[in-house]
Amino acid sequence: MAMESECNVVELIGGFFLKATLLVCQPRTGAIEGDGEEDRTFNISSAADAGVAEAVRAWTAYDGAQELPPLVIEMFLDLRRLGPQHTVVLKDQDGNPWNVCKGGKKSEIMLERWLVELDVGNEEARPEEPPNAAEIYKQLVLLFRYLYTLTQLLPANELYARLHGPSNQGEAAMPLINIGTRILDGSKPILSKGRVGLSRSIIATYTNVINETNVASHLEQKKITPISTGYGSLRITVSYRRDCNFDVNEVLDYEGNNCSSSSVVDTHTKPGVGPLSSLRRVSIHSNRSMSISPQTVYSGTVIPDPSPQRKSSSSRIQPFKAGSVGSGSLAIARNPSGSSAVATLRAQRSGSASISTHVADQAVGEPSSVGSGGSKYSSSFGKIRRQSSMRRSGSLELPAAKQAKPGERGSDELLDFVKMLEEKQELNVKKLYGTTTDISSSLVRFQSMKSNNDTLSEDLSMSYSLEPTHAPQVRYRSNSHSPIPSISPSVQYTSIPMRLSQSRNVSQTELASRKNSAERLKTLISSRTGSFSESRRQSNAGQEDILEDEDDEAEEILLSKSHLSNPTGTRLQSMSPQSLKSISSYNRAAVPFKPVSNFSCPTTMATPAHAKLHKASISSSPDNQSGLVKKDHEHSTMTGGDDDDDLLFFMSDMNLSSQ
């Protein structure tokens, strides 16, 4: 019985190595295909494979006397079908690609490494009564069920399912990359020459991860609970990569027979040949062109073509747009026929054609049109020679770009454009020194005008306050002892010109204007009242002389506003020069001015006539006084009794109080 039990245990150990190899390799590799038979050992089905059985013969032929070496099962990504145009990348958890290698550089990438062994260990640690074959069998059933579950959860299984998914069933039989397995003797050294080993960290972010164990940060390690036997412990350990989302980028170059222009890169994603859905190819089709525009997404790798036959470009590039001139819009439309763009621009702005702009024949851009493609690189830079006559609104019209030489490439145009940008051009910046000087002088002049402006504002306020409040009936006085001619109060004085300064040096132009004004006033009064006496004209002439000497004292007051009344009811006469008071003797409160608003700026108003009353500086003598009384008496006898009424009405409008 003991011998039979030991034979069963030895047989279970051999079956353990075979079943573990089948469960690890079969679900995630297409290389192992069963012949239709199933292996139902340990109550779990698996396809029987003669190749796997032959590979593990050294472990299945265990007789209990020999020492078994560890069994190593490597699972790798086969890259032997890739060419130099392929690039293998690995995407991390965020979807960021990390370059692994180019095709032909490495033959494979290690994904997993399994270690199946019979650990003899220390014989003293073995139990005195080892378990029998039935107990070991039950424990192995649980172990293989756990092993099968673990293989379905590893990242390599997801990669296999993606490569061999239902979406790739219609592709070719052999993909460019595939998952393979290898069975090795663990007692021999394992070389990683020509392949990406398991210890290599592809994603650089794992180098910053703090790891307290001996396992690398980009790897994971799982251990299955060992099963003790009388010959040692059965152990299974696996180390695998955390990330296995590998992809292959391929750039293929196809030349079309019916294409007269050079091929331009057109990138797109395409499933790989065979059942590989993750293979992305960047194909270059000769019958497709590239248009660099905001709507075009450009990605991929461009392989330069040294062939001299493809020198033309089938793309159209418009790197810049010019702004508008005036109120119109500037538009450069694509013109594939190579004709002038003026007609196209005129068609676009059908509503605004009010500008006549003449542009010389010099072209703005130099597009390239090589071969039969007929496409152009149009640029808004170049030498512009314009002769423009612009009206109120319109747009700038640009002529068509001239044709380039047939032998030029599109890249030469771009290089010339970059060189033009790098050239340093002098900027005509206007110096502000003269402008600063002008501003300073303007400020000085403005400050000097402030005092004059204040004086003018005050004078205008006083002039406005002296405006008559009512319009009396027109009456004329006939008797006056004043040397200033009397005028009708019906004339409305909206403003009284006053002096802005107290300088005594009055210009000859101002004196002449005053004389002319006095003459006009005398003419007007003479037409209304009749004729003036010779003594009156002499008095006016004498007053003009006095005006030149004493124009700075009484020029700012119109004494026609003063109110003089005679309480005795006797005949009223105008004031003589001896009875006039200077306006400077009146207090501001004594003069009944109307409240007016302050003027912030000089105000001018048109007036029909101006009257100025000046204080006479001559002293009166008895002879002069008697002469004036005599002349006044003679004049009063000629005009009659109505003169008294006229004089009374005129004097009543003088509103200056006699306080």
From Swiss-Prot:
One Pfam assignment: ATG13
UniProt keyword terms in alphabetical order: Autophagy, Cytoplasm, Protein transport, Transport
Any one Gene Ontology BP term: Cvt vesicle assembly
GO cellular component: Atg1/ULK1 kinase complex; autophagosome; cytosol; PAS complex; phagophore assembly site; vacuole-isolation membrane contact site
Location of this chain's protein in the cell: Cytoplasm; Preautophagosomal structure
InterPro entries the record matches: ATG13, Atg13_N, HORMA_dom_sf
Residue span of region Disordered: 260-280, 295-320, 353-409, 525-551, 560-579, 612-644
GO molecular function, one term: armadillo repeat domain binding
Low complexity composition-biased segments: 364-382
Biased composition (Polar residues): 525-542, 562-579, 617-627
Described function: Activates the ATG1 kinase in a nutritional condition dependent manner through the TOR pathway, leading to autophagy. Also involved in cytoplasm to vacuole transport (Cvt) and more specifically in Cvt vesicle formation. Seems to play a role in the switching machinery regulating the conversion between the Cvt pathway and autophagy. Finally, ATG13 is also required for glycogen storage during stationary phase.
Subunit and interaction comment: Interacts with ATG1 to form the ATG1-ATG13 kinase complex.
Family assignment from sequence similarity: Belongs to the ATG13 family. Fungi subfamily.
Protein name: Autophagy-related protein 13
Species: Eremothecium gossypii (strain ATCC 10895 / CBS 109.51 / FGSC 9923 / NRRL Y-1056) (Yeast)
